[in-house]
C-alpha cells in the first residue's frame, strides 16, 4: 500500500504451513483492494497435477516417475527486459533488514544469488555430471551438485536444469533427472497427504523409545560409530550432510536407538541450509519403513559396513572426526580393532549394532503382526 501496488505476484506455495499462510495473505490483500497473483511453483510440475488413472496422487515413485515424464513441463521462463522499479518511501530501509541473530550465522554459507547458482550448475555439468551416477554415494568425493539450497529457496528453478539436460542420455544425466523427480514426488505426496509432514504416512505403530542421552549423543556426533558421527558433525559444522550419510544416520536413530523419525527430522531441519519439508520428512519415513515407497522394515543399515563401502579409505571420517585422523585407511571405521584407536578421545560405541538390529526387527515384526490381526478382525 505504501508504494501504491495494485497486484502482488508470488509463486505457489504447496507445503501445508506456507499454503495456509498464502490464504491469509491473499485475504488481507484483497480486503485492501490489492490483487494477489500466484504464478508457477518451485517445481517442474506443480504438486497435484500428476495423477493416476483414478485421479489420485501416486504413493509409489516408479509409476510417478513415468507419469511425471509423460506429463512434461514448460521451458524456463523467458528472462524479462529492463524493469521499472517503484520509488520506495524514505523509511523503506527497514524493510530489508536482517535480524541480528540470523545475520550472525555460525557456518559458512554457499555464495548467494542466481549468478552463483548458475555458476555452480555449469561447474557441475562440466566436471561431475558424467560421473554422477557412480560418485553420488561417496561422501568423500565432491560428486553431487550442491544445488539443493538454491532449489529450496527458488534461486534456481528445476526447469532450467531440465532444459539443459534435455537430450543428454548418459547415466549421470539420467540419474540426476531421476533425483530431481524424487524431489517432485515427495512434494506431490505431501500435497495430497499434508498430515505426513510430521507423522507416518503408513503407520506401523512401532514401539519407539523416548529421546534420551543416546539421542543427544546422536545429535552431537558421539555415538562411537564413525560414519554416523562424521555425518552428524558435518551437519552441525556446515549445515549440509551428504545424502547417503543422511540415510545412514537416519537408520541409526530409528533402528539402532529406536527413536521415532520426527525427532531426527526436526533436528535436521534446524541445521540444514537445504531443509526441504517434503524431502526431509519423506526421506526419513523411507528409512524408517513407514512412508511411501518405504524401504522394507527389515532393512537396517549397518553403520560399519556402510562406512566401509561408501568411504573405503576412511577419508570422509577423518575429515570430520579429528580424534580418528591418526587411523589410516579403512581402520578409521573400526577404531575398536586398533590398539590406539581411542588414544585421542573418540567415544566408545553407545550401543551394539548387532543386538539393536535384532531388537528393531522384533519391534517391527510385532507391529506388523498387530496390524494384520486388526485387519482380520475388521473383516
Residue ranges and their predicted role:
Residues 1-111, 285, 304:
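Beta-rich, aromatic/charged-enriched effector core domains that present basic-aromatic interfaces
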Residues 9, 215, 344-347:
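Short coil/turn segments at secondary-structure junctions
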Residues 13-14, 135, 219-220:
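A generic structural signal for short
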Residues 55-204, 310-311, 315-379:
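Glycine/tryptophan-enriched, flexible segments
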Residues 138, 142-321:
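Active-site-proximal binding-pocket segments
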